[in-house]
Each structure stands twice: as structure tokens, then as C-alpha cells.
Amino acid sequence: MPDLLKKYWLKFTNKRKYLALKNKLNKDKELKHFKEHLEKDLNEIQFKIKNKKELNFLHSGTSGDLVNSLPVIKELSKTHKCRLYVGVDKPLEKFRPNNYSPYLLPTHTYKMLMPLLKSQNYLSEVERFNGQSIDINFDIFRNFPVSLQFDNLRYYFHVAGIQADVLSPYINVNEHEKIKNKIVIHRTFRYRNHLINYKFLQKFNDLVFIGVMKEYEDLKKDINNLQFHDCKDHLEMAMIIKSSRFFIGNSSVGHSIAEGLKVPRILEASPDFPAAYPHGDDAYDFYFQNHFEKQCAYLENKYKKN
């Protein structure tokens, strides 16, 4: 009996065998697709890294995803000249209520991100993708036949076959001239932890929110003394984070930047998609309220200037 007919027969006669066969057929389908498509792409990437002195990268993901790819590019820049081309206005496969746009990286966000990317000296060129020749396409991580609920910094390790250093800073910016020694918060509507709240932060001073106004207004309901700064671009955002006492945020471009700068930081971990992880010193994450409050108290006592 052909596998497809057998599957439907077992669906009504033997649930256990049906599920086992269904799983096998799905795995066989994944393997076939991997062998026919993705494996070839990964092998070509290894060949180009070995044989070329200049590498062109493509990334069409979110701003946070782009920042998360920088450790691999920085590592390869030690032996190659690296150019990054950014895909803009690529549609989301699924639109979710907490997305701000139907695109992974809309044009206005691309323009916000460019000054930060262009300021990194290991990127010899950063431009919008317009059909340039590409050696390493970071977008293929979305086609991996594996769950993406693992460390999102490591997605790009498995595209390039490079184990990059994520304990040392891989973003370099100057400190902000005016906004210094603040507790900097960046909390988006996506990847929130419904088990916790920020109300206890009202007893802290020097709180500043960076992000969009509606996110600030939402958090202001819980933190009366929360201030707002409208960053002109992600470079200014990075400078404010670099100058902070410590950073608090959920999985977002703000946390990705804080992770790249290696400032003291606390991640609001997402119970629904736990794919962001802190690495290095003074890097914390939490799922529960008591732990959140304890981490904030520790960093406040350690870094507050009297």
C-alpha cells in the first residue's frame, strides 16, 4: 500500500501507527527538500568563504535580526572584505497584531538602522539590496528544517559555518553627549512576558524610554516617572544605551544593540518564543517577577553614581 493511502487508513484504524508514519513522512519530506535545496546553498557558502577575499552578505530580516548577524560578519572581516546589502520591504509570511508593518524591514526602519550599520568599521559597505551579487544569504535561516526557538545570535553561525565571539562587543559607538547614566528601557508589544509587570520601577530614578510613542504611553501607565526620548535613528539609540547605567528590554532591536555593546542589561524573556539569550558579564534574563526585581536592584546598587 502506498504511504499516503496507508497514512489515511491508519488515521482511522491505529492512531499510534498513524502518528509514527505521519512523522516519518514529514521527516522524509524535510530531508528531500534539504538535500535538493538548502544543502547546496550551505556548501556553496563554505566554498566562497574558503576561496574568496571579498564577501557580499544579504539580510532582509528585521532590524534586530540584522544586528544579530554582526558577530559572524565581524569574525569573517578578519580575513575578508565584507559588504552588507539589506533587503527592504520583504513581506512577512504571517502578519501578527503586534507587528507595526506588513514588512520584515520597512523602508523607514531601514533608514533608521543605516547610520548604525555604516558606523561599524568592519563593514566596508552597507547599501540597500538592488540585485547585487551575493555570497552569503542570511535569509536562508528561515528555511532551516529545525525549530528556530534557539539562541537567535546563533542562527547565522549555522548559515556561515562560523562560531563567532559573542562574549566581546561587536558594536562600537561613542557615548551620547547629553543622556548619560540612565536606566534605559526599550519594550515593544511583541515578545512580551505576560507573567510580569514593570510597576516596581516607579521607585527608581532616571528612567528613560527609547522606542515609539505608543509603546512609551503603554508603559507610562505603570511607571509615572518614566521619561521619553525620541531617537532620531538607531545610532543615537545605541549611543544612549552605551551611556546607560543599565538597559532593560524584551527581545527587540534595543536588546540586540545592548547585547552587541555588552552594557549591563536585563532581558524580559518571552515564554512564547524564547529565542533571545544574554551572553557575557552583567547579562541577565528573567521569566518571573521576583527575579526581575532582584536583578534591577543588583544592577542599580552596582552602577548608580552617588
Describe the residue ranges of each PLM region.
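Catalytic machinery of carbohydrate-active enzymes
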Residues: 2-306
